[in-house]
Amino acid sequence: MDADEGQDMSQVSGKESPPVSDTPDEGDEPMPIPEDLSTTSGGQQSSKSDRVVASNVKVETQSDEENGRACEMNGEECAEDLRMLDASGEKMNGSHRDQGSSALSGVGGIRLPNGKLKCDICGIICIGPNVLMVHKRSHTGERPFQCNQCGASFTQKGNLLRHIKLHSGEKPFKCHLCNYACRRRDALTGHLRTHSVGKPHKCGYCGRSYKQRSSLEEHKERCHNYLESMGLPGTLYPVIKEETNHSEMAEDLCKIGSERSLVLDRLASNVAKRKSSMPQKFLGDKGLSDTPYDSSASYEKENEMMKSHVMDQAINNAINYLGAESLRPLVQTPPGGSEVVPVISPMYQLHKPLAEGTPRSNHSAQDSAVENLLLLSKAKLVPSEREASPSNSCQDSTDTESNNEEQRSGLIYLTNHIAPHARNGLSLKEEHRAYDLLRAASENSQDALRVVSTSGEQMKVYKCEHCRVLFLDHVMYTIHMGCHGFRDPFECNMCGYHSQDRYEFSSHITRGEHRFHMS
């Protein structure tokens, strides 16, 4: 017994450095505690017994840490590590636990009636002696585990092993779905969430979902503060529990009309895809000066504050602008009519002009194209639209028509004989606008507009004559046309802002500074 005590005392005094290797020494076992420490006489013998207790706890801690506790841990590493370290203390028999409680003076803890230990310095409650011992190192400054390469010291061996991987560059944790590798297990766990499909964490204020709870908590703080600054109620959406069955959600979605739900899904998905290039800032009556805005923040955080009813309004405007019939795929026109760009806009009640003596072409293909195409020309032309602007050179790059053609014609619309009830616009008499109905088929092939892909195939394009921008996707064109006002094409259909020309209108839509009057 004296030899064993001498060996333990030499280990406590620092003659033998703590092991830093990854292989645990399974042969080391905790030293037995003397049966009756209270009857020990003499200060020297009492000091020896205290050192034996401390050495015993330390050996148990080292063996526990070496048996797989050197895994990667982040912000929750201390709590998790301490709980696992205390598992060995729970395996002690009753007499051993009683003897350890009487010798807590070496650890510096106070045994509570519920069996837990209380730190005599700060009062924190620990679940076992191992946890208390690691906690006491934060007070004493003891760092027994030291790196032999740079000299950095740590309170736990798991932290040392993780630090050693910085020198070796080892990344043992690898993703089985991609080439991602990391040094920490928790980092791999967080990375695997990016491959998952579901987003179980949902905000009760705006309904946005997240994959991680931490992202939801950050969003809730921003979203709730924004709603309070706008004077809106604390909850715009009913709080949906995370354990909501997916089948119930699917049944609720089926209640929506098939055609409307399909359109909304298509439009919403396209809006989400282009959110990174079109930041939206929605402001209330307080104005720009009263609403703080961080220009360095990404759009992902800014767009989270956008309320869902605002997006629904924009989507509904696009549907009302083009009508349900126009959202269906267009009927392919004959080859003879492919010269004219098909552009949809049933905004006005159009009627086919019945002019007497109108010469007709001998080709039936051109006749069908003339019947389906009507040209609307504005009586008032804005000369400033032709002025070049350095900041809008990208829009001018899509202009392929001549100046004479622009002054001669304004907007080309493909009606496809849509019934008047399918359109949601206003008639010409109600608008009091002087539009002339002209022929759309141009006999000059130089006025034709064609877009050819890299493979040489002709692509179908949709052109907004208000902004003179081409779209290769019909849904994107539909969303864009929904931004134009019903009465004035340069009036924002979301907030009512009036622009002077297409440049100002495009800048307003791109910046997304929509001002809404909320009651």
UniProtKB/Swiss-Prot annotation:
Chief place of localization:
nucleus
Location relative to the cell: Nucleus
Question: Ranges of Low complexity compositional bias?
Answer: 38-47
Region named Disordered: 1-72, 381-406
Tell me the PROSITE patterns matching this sequence.
Answer: ZINC_FINGER_C2H2_1, ZINC_FINGER_C2H2_2
User: What does the annotation give as the result of altering Y210C?
Assistant: In CVID13; decreases binding to pericentromeric heterochromatin DNA; has diffuse nuclear localization
The Phosphothreonine modification is found at T23, T140, T398
Per the record, the covalent cross-link Glycyl lysine isopeptide (Lys-Gly) (interchain with G-Cter in SUMO) lies at K58, K241
Q: Which Gene3D superfamilies match?
A: Classic Zinc Finger
**Can you cite a GO biological process for this protein?**
chromatin organization
Ranges annotated as C2H2-type zinc finger: 117-139, 145-167, 173-195, 201-224, 462-484, 490-514
Q: List the disulfide bonds.
A: none
Q: Where is this region: Required for both high-affinity DNA binding and pericentromeric heterochromatin localization?
A: 154-163, 180-195
Tissue specificity field: Abundantly expressed in thymus, spleen and peripheral blood Leukocytes and lymph nodes. Lower expression in bone marrow and small intestine.
Instruction: Return the similarity comment.
Output: Belongs to the Ikaros C2H2-type zinc-finger protein family.
PANTHER family annotated for this entry? Answer: DNA-BINDING PROTEIN IKAROS, ZINC FINGER PROTEIN
Function, please?
Transcription regulator of hematopoietic cell differentiation. Binds gamma-satellite DNA. Plays a role in the development of lymphocytes, B- and T-cells. Binds and activates the enhancer (delta-A element) of the CD3-delta gene. Repressor of the TDT (fikzfterminal deoxynucleotidyltransferase) gene during thymocyte differentiation. Regulates transcription through association with both HDAC-dependent and HDAC-independent complexes. Targets the 2 chromatin-remodeling complexes, NuRD and BAF (SWI/SNF), in a single complex (PYR complex), to the beta-globin locus in adult erythrocytes.
Q: How does this protein assemble?
A: Heterodimer formed by the various isoforms; this modulates transcription regulator activity. Heterodimer with other IKAROS family members. Interacts with IKZF4 AND IKZF5. Component of the chromatin-remodeling NuRD repressor complex which includes at least HDAC1, HDAC2, RBBP4, RBBP7, IKZF1, MTA2, MBD2, MBD3, MTA1L1, CHD3 and CHD4. Interacts directly with the CHD4 component of the NuRD complex. Interacts directly with SMARCA4; the interaction associates IKFZ1 with the BAF complex. Interacts with SUMO1; the interaction sumoylates IKAROS, promoted by PIAS2 and PIAS3.
UniProt comment concerning the protein's domains: The N-terminal zinc-fingers 2 and 3 are required for DNA binding as well as for targeting IKFZ1 to pericentromeric heterochromatin.
User: Which disease does its entry mention?
Assistant: Defects in IKZF1 are frequent occurrences (28.6%) in acute lymphoblasic leukemia (ALL). Such alterations or deletions lead to poor prognosis for ALL.
Write down what this protein is called: DNA-binding protein Ikaros
Taxonomy, top ranks, is: Eukaryota, Metazoa, Chordata, Craniata, Vertebrata
Q: Which gene encodes it?
A: IKZF1
